[in-house]
Swiss-Prot record:
NCBIfam families in the cross-refs: lumazine-synth, PRK00061.1-4
Catalytic activity: (2S)-2-hydroxy-3-oxobutyl phosphate + 5-amino-6-(D-ribitylamino)uracil = 6,7-dimethyl-8-(1-D-ribityl)lumazine + phosphate + 2 H2O + H(+)
Protein's pathway: Cofactor biosynthesis; riboflavin biosynthesis; riboflavin from 2-hydroxy-3-oxobutyl phosphate and 5-amino-6-(D-ribitylamino)uracil: step 1/2
Enzyme Commission number(s) from the entry: 2.5.1.78
Class in the EC hierarchy, top level: transferase
Keywords: Riboflavin biosynthesis, Transferase
Entry's family note: Belongs to the DMRL synthase family.
UniProt protein name: 6,7-dimethyl-8-ribityllumazine synthase
Residue stretches spanning the membrane: none
Entry-linked CDD domains: Lumazine_synthase-I
Amino acid sequence: MNIVQGNIEAKNAKVAIVISRFNSFLVESLLEGALDTLKRFGQVSDDNITVVRVPGAVELPLAARRVAASGKFDGIIALGAVIRGGTPHFDFVAGECNKGLAQVALEFDLPVAFGVLTTDTIEQAIERSGTKAGNKGGEAALSLLEMVNVLQELEQQL
């Protein structure tokens, strides 16, 4: 039996973090979590990390697509926070953001980690950005590091 799995160390990985400015008090904590994880666990150097800031979650897929098309990165982390309000706007924004980022990953055969909070309340978002429920930015970075290595392993073995 052949088992393919990745580890989380990726010293030479070039990573782009595409981050929404909307709800910045939350997403800055997600960014801190992602950066800490990339550096501490992945051993990724500052020189290999590029942060791209966009206005909101809807803009994340387009920026991620441009980053992917450059061919300069091994993976992308998308960070943002979409909080449900009293209108259907949440469903459109969260759904299109998720779908667009998945499309980028498949189109460019590049890992795109989804670190976009989609919560019903501001309290839930706060919990997921570094308090009770961990830091989803850090979790997205772990996922990305592992997928970078999994795809490299697959390329070597297949």
